Amino acid sequence: QYHDFTLDVRLRRPRIHPGRALSTPSFFIDIDGVLYGGSAPVAKGPGVLAYLRGRGFPFLLVTNTSRMSANDIQEKLAGLGYQVNSDEILPVSLAAAEYLTHKFDAARCFLIGDDSLARLLEKHGHTVSRKEESADAVVIGQSLWADFGEIDIARRLALQGAEVIALHRDATWPDGDVTRIGLGPIVAAIESVIDGAVTVIGKPQ
């Protein structure tokens, strides 16, 4: 069951600072299951975003997917009738890359995740490895499969001081007509064998 859009227009107008196009977004809007379900947009979805834009309420579309770039998502939404710009979309993979830049400048990362996440991290100046070698961070992103060997490497690197960063901790994620195990069980497994906390980047955190 997908969210039905309702609006309360008694909202505070965003503050616009001199020299800046937008202030903090008035709305943070999820994408999958909110703007579309499967291959179809939700009823009134495109109209709601057009309404917000017309009323001067800036919004940011947020998603826990780490397998699509902002441009990929923008193209998908355009095909569903949504008129949005790529800079109005924040995938969790981009948020993670920016977090690593803020924390480490150029981080050495051990990655549990797919190649699209590896490419994005490298594009932002980080080094990505799937081997057990010195690392600043263990990054856990979406992957069809993760094995105990990777979790064991992550454990040892964490014990050596690497920060463990998970893109989210959703228990499952939709993949067409089925659901698959998400990052939540992987994060829980790593948490059970390390002393420190896992940094979670995505929503709702």
Task: Name each model-derived stretch.
Residues 2:
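Cationic, low-complexity basic patches in intrinsically disordered or flexible, solvent-exposed regions
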